[in-house]
Swiss-Prot record:
It comes from Pseudomonas paraeruginosa (strain DSM 24068 / PA7) (Pseudomonas aeruginosa (strain PA7)). The gene is uppP. HAMAP family: Undec_diphosphatase. The chain crosses the membrane at residues 47-67, 85-105, 108-128, 183-203, 218-238, 249-269. Belongs to the UppP family. Keywords: Antibiotic resistance, Cell inner membrane, Cell membrane, Cell shape, Cell wall biogenesis/degradation, Hydrolase, Membrane, Peptidoglycan synthesis, Transmembrane, Transmembrane helix. This is Undecaprenyl-diphosphatase. Its EC number is 3.6.1.27.
Length: 277
């Protein structure tokens, strides 16, 4: 493994780990950064699956106590059963639309301009959602109803557009639908588990011929890096939301999106090959 390839794997692992669970769009950042450092082609598809799986495993580890409790109580406790049902309800809209439209979306929307526009629009919506008056009906994830779960699941489908952000769509959706900031964030993390594992399994099977033994060192660098930085990001976000709003992320989205649009408009960066990830 050449040092430059290892460096590319490290950088993309950092980007995935830091952005996957922040409401700033990991896919959008991956598309932009991968193009800037020249990491693309067939190997990039397999690599992306690996680092996304690492990020979700970090969340599984962080919430292992809650997961164990739900599994243990599932046969007899109504609260654990309702939580599990809510996750399944929120999970299925993305499954249905993903199967129907994933390839079409990847072909037509995986480009920096779509990412930039989605970043800006999502940032504006995030600011609006944070500034409106909130009526909190569900303080904790265990207080959610199946209707709350269904609405958040539908909101998650918006993240099929690169630049929208899966966590951003589910968290802001949760706030708009009456969840507390803590409940919306935690449910977004839990919903990420079946959603991202399902996507990784589907993509892994679809691109199974791209996984080659000679790429294992590159995958290992990306996997470890993504896992470590995802753990850092998850813990930091859970601590951050205790005393802060999501406005800082909204302004970051808007600024980053406008920067991409400016580099495109004034031909400062050639984005013509971006999106091959």
């Amino acid at each position: 493994m050449e040092w430059w390839t290892a460096f590319q794997a490290f950088i993309l692992g950092v980007v995935e780990g830091l952005t996957e669970f922040l409401p700033i769009s990991s896919t959008g950042h991956q598309i932009i950064v991968a193009d800037l450092i020249g990491f693309g082609g067939e190997r990039a598809k397999a690599f992306n699956i690996i680092i996304q799986l690492a990020a979700i495993l970090a969340v599984v580890w962080e919430f292992r106590g809650k997961i164990f409790q739900v599994v243990r109580d599932l046969p007899s406790q109504h609260q654990a059963q309702r939580f599990t049902v809510n996750l399944l309800i929120a999970f299925f809209p993305a499954v249905i639309l993903g199967v129907l439209f994933a390839d079409l979306i990847h072909e037509w929307l995986f480009n920096p301009i779509t990412v930039a526009l989605a970043l800006v629009v999502g940032g504006v919506i995030m600011l609006w959602a944070e500034r409106r008056q909130h009526v909190i009906r569900a303080e904790h994830v265990d207080d959610m109803t199946w209707k709350d779960a269904l609405k958040i699941g539908c909101a998650q489908c918006l993240a099929m557009v690169p630049g929208t952000s899966r966590s951003g769509a589910t968290i802001i959706g949760g706030l708009l639908f009456g969840l507390s900031r803590k409940a919306a964030t935690e449910f977004s993390f839990f919903l990420a588990m079946p959603t991202m594992v399902g996507a990784a399994v589907y993509s892994g099977y679809k691109y199974r011929e791209l996984f080659r033994p000679e790429d294992l060192p590159v995958f290992a660098v990306g996997f470890v890096t993504s896992f470590v930085f995802a753990m850092v990001a998850v813990r930091a976000l859970l601590k951050f939301i205790g005393n802060h709003s999501y406005a800082a992320f909204a302004w970051y989205r808007i600024a980053f999106g406008l920067l991409i649009l400016a580099t495109w408009q004034f031909h400062l960066i050639d984005w013509s090959t971006a999106g091959d990830l």
